[in-house]
């Protein structure tokens, strides 16, 4: 896929973006290609959709797809309406209520939310490397800065639990701006933290302290932030048999010749286990569409339609690791992709 970046755009029009698209004022220019930004997990799927879109629609320009991380992508998306802002935010978690409010404040009032499929937060090691049956509690005790409110003293996995290997804790994972990191916190770390009833009760009595104790990751080198580069995490663990990597299931699926998935609560990170939500790290993936751009950016409707053509089980996205949504969710997503239903934000947290 040819990637094109534009730096000169028309200023935001007061009336509508479509007015901007008609001629370009203030010495600027409009975009002739769709621009999507966001999740590194969604990136390979969005990129493949873009490539197939160009093959099917040769009269449209190649979409611009950027891996910025979910949080940064939504921030760019919510910055305003106009050709200098993205048309789509790719997200490995649902938009937060605070992000939705920021969008509204900046005039991004018409947003369509589309769940494009499922993914799982995979824990993996090199082929022939360290193996263990992880649980949310074990991961939390190994990675928390203050496990259960106490000082972190574990240096090896055996320090966490006597049944685990006496190898140093070394985990390569996503940065704080990543949707994968958010999902790691929500699905694994908090679940592990709240195995202690006192920590669960703390959520009601002291929300900030609960957030600190349950989600803050240690910074002493046991957890290494690898930026929005999941392929680099694969390379790191491939080169160190005692290291563990955390990334989206699609990267595990893509690299099964090099790495192996670790079980969580005895459940392997497989397509079937993620689709059934038996795997504890299963999560939905989304794209958010800026409806104000639908009639102004050529190809935006068609690009979203290409997503809907691609996400079925056995389709092109499944071939690179996307897990299909349940039938009822997929039906709602297909409707949203054609009708561009407005997100009201009431269910966001």
Regions found by a protein language model. Give the residues of each.
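C-terminal motif of bacterial Sec signal peptides marking the signal peptidase cleavage site
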Residues: 16-19
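Flexible loop/hinge segments at secondary-structure junctions
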Residues: 21-349
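Bacterial N-terminal signal peptides that target proteins for export
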Residues: 1-9
């Amino acid at each position: 896929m040819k990637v094109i970046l534009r730096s000169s755009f028309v200023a935001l029009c007061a009336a509508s973006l479509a007015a901007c698209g008609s001629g370009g004022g203030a010495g600027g220019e409009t975009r002739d290609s769709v621009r999507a930004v966001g999740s590194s997990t969604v990136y390979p799927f969005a990129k493949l959709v873009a490539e197939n879109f160009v093959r099917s629609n040769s009269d449209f320009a190649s979409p611009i797809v950027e891996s910025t991380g979910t949080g940064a992508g939504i921030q760019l998306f919510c910055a305003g309406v106009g050709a200098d802002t993205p048309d789509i935010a790719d997200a490995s978690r649902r938009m937060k209520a605070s992000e939705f409010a920021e969008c509204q404040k900046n005039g991004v009032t018409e947003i369509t939310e589309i769940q494009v499929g499922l993914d799982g937060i995979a824990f993996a090691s090199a082929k022939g490397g360290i193996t263990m049956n992880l649980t949310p509690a074990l991961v939390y005790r190994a990675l928390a800065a203050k496990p259960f409110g106490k000082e972190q003293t574990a240096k090896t996995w055996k320090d966490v639990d006597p049944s685990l290997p006496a190898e140093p804790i070394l985990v390569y994972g996503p940065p704080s701006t990543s949707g994968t990191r958010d999902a790691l916190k929500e699905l694994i770390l908090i679940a592990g933290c709240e195995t202690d009833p006192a920590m669960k009760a703390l959520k009601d009595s002291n929300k900030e302290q609960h957030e600190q104790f349950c989600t803050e990751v240690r910074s002493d080198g046991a957890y290494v932030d690898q930026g929005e580069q999941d392929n680099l995490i694969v390379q790191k663990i491939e080169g160190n048999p005692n290291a563990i990597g955390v990334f989206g299931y699609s990267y595990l699926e893509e690299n099964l010749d090099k790495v192996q998935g670790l079980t969580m609560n005895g459940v392997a990170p497989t397509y079937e286990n993620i689709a059934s939500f038996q795997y504890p790290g299963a999560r939905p993936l989304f794209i958010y569409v800026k409806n104000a751009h639908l009639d102004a950016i050529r190809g935006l409707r068609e690009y979203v339609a290409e997503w809907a053509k691609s996400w079925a089980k056995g389709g092109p996205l499944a071939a690179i690791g996307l897990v299909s949504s349940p039938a009822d969710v997929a039906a709602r997503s297909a409707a949203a992709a054609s009708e561009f239903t407005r997100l009201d934000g009431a269910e966001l947290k």
